[in-house]
Amino acid sequence: MKKVYVIGSLNMDLCISAPYCPKGGETLSGSGFIANEGGKGANQAAAAAKSGAEVYMCGCVGADPFGGRLVSALDDAGADTRYVRRAEGVSTGIAVIIVTGGENRIILDKGANAALCEEDIDRALENAGAGDVFLTQSENPVKIVGYALKRAKEKGLLTIFNPAPADPAAAEYFRFADIVVRPALKSC
């Protein structure tokens, strides 16, 4: 069976609905607060694992409770998390999502996602081979995403790139992607 390698983000999604976005200095009552495991990379890995694929997740979380929760959720989904590194001195990535009128507004703190490095990529792809599948997106530093796409392509993997969130610098790495996924809107 082919393997699926996901190199990407792991975030805690903190989502709340509000009638409108508060103005500076204003406190507003919200409702329906949800704390979900997320991050585009973690979501890809969980979905692929739940569909029966052999999935290896590579990413970076903080050495904090949110990081532990994210790794546990991926383990529960059936993904292999041996390539998820716990970084000291940095918090796990957080997405604060405010939903107003059915539309979301997201504030992202990349946190440990920004600590992903070339060594993490090399370690995760060490046993990858031709015909395996590689998924990534843009919630990690764009140069690391580009490095990962290039390494996966060199090893003969089918490379899939979801360039979200949008970063004009990511276009430089489209040449290493067999498939570029058009980003979609997200809701809680």
Task: Please place each PLM-identified region on the residue numbering.
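Glycine-rich phosphate/adenosyl-contacting loop at the front of the ribokinase-like
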Residues: 1-60, 65-72, 76-79
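Ribokinase/PfkB-type carbohydrate-kinase core domain
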Residues: 1-10, 72-86, 98-188
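Beta-strand->loop->alpha-helix junctions that form or flank phosphate-binding loops
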Residues: 32, 58-63, 82-91, 163-164
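Short alpha-helical
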Residues: 43, 64-65, 91, 142-143, ...
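Short alpha-helix plus adjacent loop in nuclease-associated cores
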Residues: 92-97
